[in-house]
UniProtKB/Swiss-Prot annotation:
It comes from the Bacteria. It comes from Desulfitobacterium hafniense (strain Y51). Belongs to the UPF0597 family. GO terms for biological process: L-cysteine catabolic process to pyruvate. It holds the Pfam family SDH_alpha. This is UPF0597 protein DSY1109.
């Protein structure tokens, strides 16, 4: 079927892509802290002498072990806060610390050593919650980000509320409704979308994400998973697809100062959803238009799987993106609904349940595993093999399987998430 431009699904899917495929420089959780800190400092009108942060446990998990870019290798919540205060430009949003000069890098270190920055675990039921209070002389500013990385819900200065209604649900409802996402409609949209409607978005994704993957291959970042794959596994397209996605993560998790186009609020998911598809399109000589349509499939499938799980979870988000890239690769090979649906189910059955233990270099290895599952999921179906309803969390019907994955990630792994965070915090204190 052909989807017309005025169709409700067409406009919804296009809006979702525009909301989600945005640029971010640095791992998005520390960057969200830097963004909030920069905005709060602007409202305060001065560099604070004291800062108190109250953050949800998942923020601690995702900031603890990742390098904050443009800080000369600093890690952690305090470093992200200092970077935002000293060098942040809040109008750049998730590229808030993309432009930091050498003098500012030194000022960040000095500020960290001389300033009281206190971090507390927030007494909050919200998975994504950042509350920043800054003090300068007799003035203070409170700022809160909730639910997703750029959603400022409250700004208060000296007792006066200057922004926000206090309604934490308002930001989520302002996003385009994800309930309309389905595998069949995503494929229909990808077949029908006018290229001019998505070209600018996808050109940036191709350019930015390919650039950081090349940097990961050429530099010495993290555990160099991408380079190890190419050196030890060979140069087949299946290996290159995994290696490029892993190399992008190698670089990003270790502070590479290049932006990426994210997906579901995550750079790792944005790279995993796109780089394997880009690599396969080059190998197959698919052409520009086919690549764009395959990227529409991979990005929207990733978002569809991730929606039920939520922004942050104990369920590793790149698993969703690995399923997405597998779907995009199936599309490049001429696959339709059956091929894509079975690819997703097969891939999800293989790697669902890999835990998220925060942003750090080993994410690159998980990306390699997720992409491998996506490719294997497609190749299994091509060979007439599949996992069937009743095999573990696999249900009859792709949408039922996706719903099971969402339930597992959002509800089933809540206690797992708590124990992962307990382990990580105990490591910090020991």
């Amino acid at each position: 079927m052909f989807m017309e431009r005025q169709d409700r699904y067409y406009q919804t899917y296009l809006n979702i892509l525009k909301e989600e495929l945005v640029a971010a420089m640095g791992c998005t959780e520390p960057i969200a802290i830097a963004y909030g800190a920069a905005k709060a400092r602007e409202v305060l009108g001065a560099v604070p002498h004291k800062v108190v942060l109250e953050v949800s446990s998942n923020i601690i998990k995702n900031v603890k072990s990742v390098v904050v870019p443009n800080t000369d290798g600093l890690k952690g919540i305090e470093a992200a806060t200092a970077a935002g205060i000293i060098a942040g430009r809040s109008d750049k949003i998730l590229e808030v610390i993309a432009e930091v000069c050498q003098a500012e890098k030194q000022q960040i270190k000095t500020y960290l050593s001389e300033t009281d920055i206190e971090v507390k675990l927030a007494d909050s039921q919200i998975i994504f919650d950042i509350m920043i209070t800054m003090f300068h002389q007799d003035s203070y500013v409170k700022l809160r980000i909730a639910d997703y990385h750029t959603h400022i819900v409250h700004i208060e200065k000296n007792g006066e509320i200057i922004f926000g209604t206090g309604d934490l649900d308002a930001g989520i409802s302002s996003l385009t409704d994800r309930k309309l996402l389905s595998v069949s409609k995503i494929i229909e949209f990808a077949d029908s979308v006018r290229i001019e409607d998505v070209k600018e978005l996808l050109d940036k994704q191709i350019e930015y994400n390919s650039a950081i993957a090349r940097a990961g291959m050429e530099g010495n970042y993290g555990a160099n998973v991408g380079r190890v794959l190419l050196k030890t596994y060979g140069n087949d397209v299946k290996i290159r697809a995994k290696a490029m996605a892993a190399a992008g993560s190698d670089a990003r998790m270790s502070g590479c100062e290049l932006p990426v186009i994210i997906n579901s609020g995550s750079g790792n998911q944005g790279m995993t959803a796109s780089l394997p598809v880009i690599e396969y399109a080059a190998e197959l000589q698919s052409g520009e238009e086919k690549l764009y349509r395959a990227l529409v499939v991979s990005n929207l499938i990733t978002l569809h799987l991730k929606t039920g799980i939520g922004r942050l979870s104990a369920f590793c988000g790149v698993i969703c993106a690995g399923c997405g890239s597998g779907a995009g690769i199936a599309y490049l090979h001429g696959g339709g609904y059956d091929e894509i649906a079975h690819t997703i189910v097969n891939a999800a059955a293989i790697v669902s349940g890999i835990v998220c233990d925060g942003a750090k270099p080993s994410c690159a290895g998980k990306i390699a595993a997720a992409v491998d599952a996506g490719i294997l999921g497609y190749l299994m179906y091509k060979e007439g093999q599949q996992f069937r309803g009743g095999d573990g969390i696999v249900a009859k019907g792709i949408e039922n399987t996706i719903a099971n994955i969402g339930y597992l990630g959002k509800v089933g792994m809540k206690e797992t998430d708590k124990e992962i965070i307990n382990i990580m915090l105990n490591q910090c204190s020991s």
